[in-house]
Regions:
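Short beta-strand elements in bilobed, periplasmic/extracellular small-molecule ligand-binding domains
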Residues: 2, 24-38, 143-146
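Short, well-structured alpha-helical segments in soluble
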Residues: 44-56
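Short, high-confidence coil segments that cap the C-terminus of an alpha-helix
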Residues: 57-58, 162
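Anion-binding alpha/beta catalytic cores of soluble intermediary-metabolism enzymes, centered on
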Residues: 60-114, 118, 156, 173
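Glycine-rich phosphate/diphosphate-binding loop of Rossmann-like nucleotide-binding domains
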Residues: 7-21, 97-191, 196, 200-217
Length: 253
């Protein structure tokens, strides 16, 4: 069983959790969502993790991020038993976070080779940016990681010259038209989940940038239905491994 601990509610997290539970159940396994109020304390979250870890049925624990500001995220993640840390977020865990692994699996399935490629990653989080950069460097790519302090001229040039852009900023329009090289087929991996000016679910990539990438014959991953979907699939694969299951029927479509 997978235990998912959620503090409070927001649209993106609620949607993501529903997709996780559905995929796990479709694969013949079980998941339980433990909802805690937004007003709970760090100690309340730690207690929930301890109780889940003591369950004889529980094989994996994940804490849905982001957590409210008053919760000590570092203490929470460190408290997840390493052998149950399916998300790989405990600093002592040997596992990589799910999303970078899912992106690497997708690149392999699409036959997109990394050796010699120039990759620009927007965002340096512990959840996506940093671990993905390490995986891509190990695979032979030249990787540039940008953050909120990166000057705009450098950001634009790094994206324009890239073969692959990964945006994990969490801001619609973080990648706009001027970042796209009109003369090459680029791969743009959109990790963000946001709302545009019309309230429609979208990623970090602006509509004009997405259109230009696709018009040039490149790939711009969809939101929804892209990275989030791959991450859920990676979750199911990892849960099956933790439960000692084998077979192709564990992988959701």
């Amino acid at each position: 069983m997978l235990a998912i601990i959620q503090v409070g509610h927001n649209d993106a997290s609620d949607r993501y959790i529903r997709n996780k539970v559905k995929a796990v159940m479709q694969a013949g396994m079980t998941a339980e969502v433990i909802n805690l109020p937004e007003t709970c304390t760090t100690l309340d979250v730690l207690d929930a993790i301890t109780l889940a870890g003591r369950s004889s049925e529980c094989r994996a624990i994940m804490v849905q991020l982001p957590l409210p500001d008053h919760i000590n995220k570092e203490a929470v993640l460190r408290s997840i038993p390493e052998h149950m840390d399916i998300d790989g977020l405990n600093p002592r865990s040997d596992l990589m976070p799910l999303t970078p692994c899912a992106i690497m699996r997708w690149l392999k399935e699409q036959h997109i080779r990394l050796p010699g490629k120039n990759v620009t990653i927007l965002g340096r989080s512990e959840l996506v940016g940093k671990p993905l950069a390490n995986l891509m460097i190990e695979a032979g790519a030249t990787v540039t990681v940008l953050n909120s302090l990166t000057e705009e001229w450098f950001r634009r040039n790094a994206c324009y010259s890239a073969d692959i852009i990964v945006s994990a900023v969490g801001k619609w329009g973080a990648v706009f038209r001027d970042y796209v090289n009109n003369g090459k087929k680029m791969v743009v991996i959109d990790v963000g989940i946001n709302r545009d000016n019309d309230g429609k679910l979208c990623g970090d990539v602006s509509h004009l940038a997405r259109e230009l990438v696709e018009r040039n014959g490149g790939i711009c991953t969809p939101v929804p239905g892209g990275v989030g979907k791959w991450t859920v699939r990676e979750l199911v694969i990892r849960l099956a491994e933790m439960e000692g299951r084998h077979g192709t029927n564990i992988v959701p479509e």
